[in-house]
């Protein structure tokens, strides 16, 4: 195996694997290095499914990025035998006038002329029999959004990257970096590898390893859980046209997915999580009583027909920045190093376009996408890390 490459990608999860594909597709000699064997269950993006929304409650600035991501997912599905996307639509709702997230989602849809429908109170329960909400709730339904099959996405990118000549080095943690303006060296237990350019997308491990590149970003990894629950398939399944959803209630934001082929309704509590070290995280669902209790609390009140037996649970990670916006930028000192970090629990849907962006940054030092909101130099990153 060669030890010198045009570009080395450290961290071959969703973002890194996508970057590897877009690099290799251009004929760039690419090495992807990962501590595990992606797709795997040790990072941030397993658990079968992820939502892709276009009208974006985290900020209308994300909409063009989301739309490009969707285009790339469609392209990926045409190039692979894996199922990538299902257009379930996405329903976002919460108390009228009491949810900044719902309000921003509606504003984003209006500003960017995205197809959508609005509902209030009983209109919502009339449309979807499985939803129970107070009369003062409002909702926006975005029919063109839906669900991505996360492991399939990563697997497809890996297969295509390798088909285009990329090398994937698994079970190889990076121990150290040496960087100059025209050469990058990564050091591992299997040896050292060099490249002209480096892409760093290490997920939760960014919080531990970026300092070796003389980059300090206030990143905090969190333990996050999802559960799959027995449900009334006639109400809550994809076959019954039940949508993916995000709901803001008194104690935070919940998100979930319809049952696919009897999988059960999947639900997560976005506002939950323990601060962790990615090397010592407890990966057992139910290790904390709140793992299941928080999910049941929501189901009992808002989706009682899905409050059945727990079929399975999964543990993954969020890595948050103080403002919960991403970091996608070039190294402040070395323009041959591109960094992707801090996706704060809402990044997977963008991994296609993040991969494209990283490939552009690595090969040309710039990107066609507006990534100013993701700058390393923004004020929020100069403050203390998330507590």
From Swiss-Prot:
Where is this gene product found? Cytoplasm
List the transmembrane segments.
none
Instruction: Give the EC number.
Output: 1.5.3.1
SUPFAM superfamilies attached here? FAD-linked reductases, C-terminal domain, FAD/NAD(P)-binding domain
The main place the protein resides is cytoplasm
S-8alpha-FAD cysteine, modified sites: 316
Positions binding FAD in this chain are 6-36
Query: How is the cofactor bound, as the UniProt entry phrases it?
Result: Binds 1 FAD per subunit.
Q: What class of enzyme is it?
A: oxidoreductase
Query: What is the protein's known function?
Result: Catalyzes the oxidative demethylation of sarcosine.
To which protein family does this belong? Belongs to the MSOX/MTOX family. MSOX subfamily.
> Under what name is this protein listed?
Monomeric sarcosine oxidase
> Which species is this record about?
Bacillus sp. (strain NS-129)
């Amino acid at each position: 195996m060669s030890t010198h490459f045009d570009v080395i990608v450290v961290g071959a999860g969703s973002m890194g694997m996508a970057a590897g594909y877009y690099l290799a597709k251009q004929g760039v000699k690419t090495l992807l290095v990962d501590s595990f064997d992606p797709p795997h269950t040790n990072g941030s993006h397993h658990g079968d499914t992820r939502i892709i929304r276009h009208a974006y409650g985290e900020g209308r600035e994300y909409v063009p990025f989301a739309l490009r991501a969707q285009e790339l997912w469609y392209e990926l599905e045409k190039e692979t035998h894996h199922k990538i996307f299902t257009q379930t639509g996405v329903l976002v709702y919460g108390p009228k006038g009491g949810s900044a997230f719902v309000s921003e989602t509606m504003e984003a849809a209006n500003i960017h002329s995205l197809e959508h429908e609005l509902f209030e109170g009983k209109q919502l329960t009339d449309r979807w029999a499985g939803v129970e909400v107070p009369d003062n709730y409002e909702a926006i339904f975005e029919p063109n959004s839906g669900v991505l099959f996360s492991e399939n996405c990563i697997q497809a990118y890996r297969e295509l990257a390798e088909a285009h000549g990329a090398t994937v080095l698994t079970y190889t943690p990076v121990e150290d970096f040496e960087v100059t303006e025209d050469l990058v060296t990564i050091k591992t237990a299997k040896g050292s590898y060099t490249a002209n350019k480096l892409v760093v997308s290490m997920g939760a491990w960014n919080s531990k390893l970026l300092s070796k590149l003389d980059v300090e970003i206030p990143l905090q990894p969190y333990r996050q859980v999802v559960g799959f629950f027995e449900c009334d398939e006639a109400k809550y399944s994809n076959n019954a046209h039940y949508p993916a959803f995000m709901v803001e209630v008194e104690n935070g934001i919940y998100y979930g997915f319809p049952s696919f082929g009897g999988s059960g309704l999947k639900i997560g509590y976005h506002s939950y999580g323990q601060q962790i070290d990615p090397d010592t995280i407890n990966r057992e669902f139910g290790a904390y009583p709140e793992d299941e209790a928080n999910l049941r609390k929501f189901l009992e009140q808002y989706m009682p027909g899905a409050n059945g037996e727990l079929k399975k649970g999964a543990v993954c990670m969020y890595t948050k920045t103080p403002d919960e916006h991403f970091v996608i930028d070039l190294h402040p000192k070395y323009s041959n190093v591109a960094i992707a970090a801090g996706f704060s629990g809402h990044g997977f849907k963008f991994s296609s376009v993040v991969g494209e962006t990283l490939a552009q940054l690595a090969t040309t030092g710039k990107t066609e996408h507006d990534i100013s909101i993701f700058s390393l130099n923004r004020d929020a990153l100069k403050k203390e890390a998330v507590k």
